[in-house]
Amino acid sequence: MASAMESDSGGGSGGADAQPPLAEVDGGLARVTRQLLLSGDDPAARLRALMPLELGIFGLGDLAQPVLVRDFLNTLTLMSGHAYPAAVLRHHAYYLLRAASFSRRSFGLGHLEAALDVLASSLPPTTASPATDDPLDGSRLIADTRALAAEYRRIIEEGSGEVLAVSGPTATFAFVEELVADTYLARWDAFPREGLSFYAFNAAKTTLGRWLVTVYAETNRYPWAAAGQGQPTAADIKAMAVELVEHSGGRAGGGEGEESGGGGLFHRPESLSSVVASLPLARRRAVEILGVYAEASGGQTPPVAAVPVLAFDAARLRLLEPSGALFYDYVYEALLWDQTYGVPDSVIEAFLAGMAAEMEALAARVQEAAGSRASFSPAAIEQVATVLLSAGLNETVAGDYAMMLASVPRVSRSRWRWLEATAALLESLSGFALHFFRLLPTASPTSRFARVARAAYLRAEAEAKDRRARRTSGPSTPAATAVGVGAVADPWDAVTPLRIFIVPPPAAEYEQVAGDLSSELLRSLLWVRYSRLWQAPAPAPALPCKPPLLPGEQGRRQWTAAVAAVPRTDVEAYCRSLRAGQTARADPAYVRSPFFPAAFIEFQIWPALRRVLSNELPKTRSLAALRWLVSFGSDLALPSPELTRARRPLELIYATVWEIYDGAPPMPGESPQAVGLRPLNLEGEGKAGDAGADGAEDEEGGGPWGLSSHDAVLRIMDAVREVSGIISETISASERAAEAPPLAWPTSLFSLLFTLRYSTTAESLGLATRRFLVSGETLSEDISRLTGAAWRLCSRPLLYDAETGRVQIPLATEEEEEAVVAVKEKSVSSSPRHYSTDLQTLKSVVEGIQDVCRDAAARWALATADTATLRRRLLVPALRESRGIADHPLWAHTSEPLRPDLEELNERVEHALELGYSLTGALRRSVAYRFRDYTFARLFQPPAIDAERAEAIVRRDARPPPVFTPAPRRLPQGGADTPPPLSMDDIMYLGKSICKALVDVLDHHPAAPETTPIKTYTPAMDLNPEQITVTPRSPSVLAAFARTARVQTHHLVPALTDDSPSPVGQTPPPFRILPAKKLAAILLGNGRNASKRRASRDLSPPPHGRWRAVLDSSPFSFSSSDFSDQDEGEGGKADLRGVPGGGGGGEGAYEEERERPSDIDTAARARKVETSCPRRRSPRTTPSPSRRASGGGGGPDRGEAEAHTCPPYLSAAAAASRVRPRTRRGATRRPPRPTAEDE
């Protein structure tokens, strides 16, 4: 919309000189005119014809064509004998300008000027001054609109950050809202206009601290404040990079075995092939430094795969200032992945305590900037944005933190004191920042943004509630309590500050317009539009006084004559004889009777509404009946407080039911292409010129509509309750009050409407849950073979020949292999077997096992977070409405309460998520997860004796140099938990899936080792073969997940269907969401057209034989090829080993879900969401690099995928030139993508 208007707002093409195209731009007004001609004298047909203009929008191009406007007004003139079309004709300038919009096509200010000229020519000639008392006077509206257009043009051309202020009736125009939104968009694009004070830069004690702030500010092109140390120049940036590399870089080695403070800034992480667990944030930091260093030194940037990660030591960790807490993402990432680089726990805990305190202070500053404001405040929004940006938190950083926290298992937060509190504050701040910066670019006092802000606020409330619920039910083990994990409270209120985006509805402007409308029906439809646009209740209608407001003595004589002419009994008989939806013309003799309102309410509104709510009528007839109740006799009936109060909620019921059946009409500021809707085609669904498009159009033919709002069913229930009160008052005042049956409403229509709204959501979420469970079962089966082999590998001492560099791995004897599954007895073998390999191959196997296990744990944690996000996005709004329905006071007047059963689906999804968290925790506690860092850490430590020590021993030096003290022998514990040694199947599996050198180079038939010493250095001292022993973990079986997942997948009937059996002795609820096939049959029976049947297609899971094909396309699946190239053998039957505790529960069952930001997604999942919910807006379909890389299991593309995962670095040349163009959305800028030369 902005680009469309900008195309006409600048240069020589703007203003009145820009001529609109001669061809028809949009068929909206033409179709309405045709429908009006076909309606004749039927008031219900006239209402149906004008409904798109009452509730929707159309393109400005129609108003710029004199022929379309002339035909529309001439058609209204033919019907000017009726009150409703006469009122539209009288206020036609307001009526047409209110629904005109820029967003339907690429319209600009030139089209607006042409439309105003056409409307000015359509006004009747008058000698009165335009400054009349009528606020809806056409001349005044056109003059006000021209002034607004000129003001808009000035604001955009000056670019001073001003916004368009609107009041009066023009504030209700759709295109005026779009002009206002465009000025706010320009304001936020240029934010921040003033320099930011990066206090972390001035407080930094090290070059690294200043570098991190500089990279953040320069990459996002944020202006620096004049005060303080000042903005670094390009030379300063290069000098910092050179100092970091040449004076602080150190050696690219290290690990947990290093001494405190003995390493440099760059280290090689333990996991290199893993995409998520290889510290991508730390690697990005290193790439930024080395990239600028390469440019400064005239070299080439090294490949990303060869770049070490940015690390830390005790000395540097102490020097990191708390004021830059949000710049140290690489530190938090390393700690959450157990990478300490030898830093003592006391230093880590002191660092975390300082960071937690600083984040609490930042949250307090955000709260102070937001203040106690409860409505839209641009000044408060700018203050909060300044606080967040100055602290180093924008949308990109918040997304990085959200992804990091979602990919790390929950139990990883329990290692150090203050780590849980720090992670909770990071999670809360990043979640708030994501909501804030996603709302910021479009923030404006418009109806479209009001709906977006309300939805975001409710979603943030649901997220905060889920976080509190899972935090209170988190781990409370003694170990967790010892480090202060279980006592962490909600860090701060991250929801209330978002109220600065809540836009109050312009009730005063609508009141002013409604007071000047001459038709009660037109006034009621105005408030229906208000309720729909702003999602706010309309004020109570102004009730006319009794007797009816007819002028003077003539009115009283007419009322007395009507009473005398038509007795009450005749009026009641007439109302009984009417057929709702079929009687077109009203008899004035009866309709103008003062007895007509009560009789019409009792004998038509009550029974007709009962038939509609019982779903006895097809959809078209139900809508026709509601439309008839609203419009019948409205032009002839005397003003009546009862009938006015009864018809207002009926209009709302009609509009809302129409929304749910056919979708909501487009609203101001929304484009069908932008929100995933089909383009406007008011000529019907068929081809152009189809004969059926004119006469036989059904209700849904008018429609480019989208989905209805989340509270649509609740709005219908509120309206029915309001009508119930009016009917009760009317009946109690009649003579038949004692004979009247009790007022009770059926629930069939509510059941069907709720089904229409949430059947697709329930089916898609149920299918995603079943896929998630099957993916977990597949992963547990695949990874259990790897973890079982790792557990058996470390269960026996390994013999190492120092001269040949060969390692002898004990193998299970034939008797042991036969007894693996049968019994757990010790099998005595007189001929032990060994498998020989070299030490480097063993290291590769150990590293590969840890990499695969960590990668699987990280990918499964992301899959679990995806499922939790899907639940929160799809199910939480439905649960809010279903709970509101269940507790609605309308059920006091119904035959049986409506009990939506979405709680059952919610319980199933939550149970599946608990299983997912338990699997993540089990993977992290397995032996394989820390196979290199802990179990075989000795292999990667410096040698126990080096060349200098050996030379000292040979020369009999009296003072030999010190040596590293060898690790004590850690022999495995015996007993029932001791596994058998490795089998040949395990060797073959590890060789094919982890390290091919294990089986391709060496002999596959090893012989027993020599019993003689391997090497004799002197006759006096022999060195026996060194035994590499490790401490195995306690075994455990993760069969609980597989069994539960299998039961959930194959034995449970999908929730929310009529096929679900009710418990014995319990009456099934009267309302259940129907399965797709039954829903399709109901929709066909109710006359739903083909374009709407797509929303109810069968989403049931594929047959059992097709699950593999389904899983192959699922982003949640982990195929066996990710871990093995062969079928499972004997070793594959073992469950996940090395997990303390039993089953898949325990501490892992309390894993807390972590939501990933919405823009971190996969294209495959985006396509599936679009397939499951074709009428919903699709999320961003561009997958993040990390998700694309993590989707694959390995192979030749792993290096390339890993290269794309690392974010780009700061270009020193670009920083030096400082001419990089400023991107739009100043508060949501992202770092530039690397060019081909950079890579």
Swiss-Prot record:
Its main location: virion. Residues 1139-1148 have a biased composition (Gly residues). Belongs to the herpesviridae inner tegument protein family. Residues 1151-1170 have a biased composition (Basic and acidic residues). Residues 1112-1123, 1180-1189 have a biased composition (Low complexity). Residues 1-20, 669-704, 959-980, 1087-1239 are annotated as: Disordered. Keywords: Host cytoplasm, Host Golgi apparatus, Host nucleus, Virion, Virion tegument. It comes from Epstein-Barr virus (strain GD1). This is Inner tegument protein. GO terms for biological process: virion assembly. Residues 615-1239 are annotated as: Interaction with large tegument protein. GO terms for cellular component: host cell Golgi apparatus; host cell nucleus; viral tegument. It comes from the Viruses.
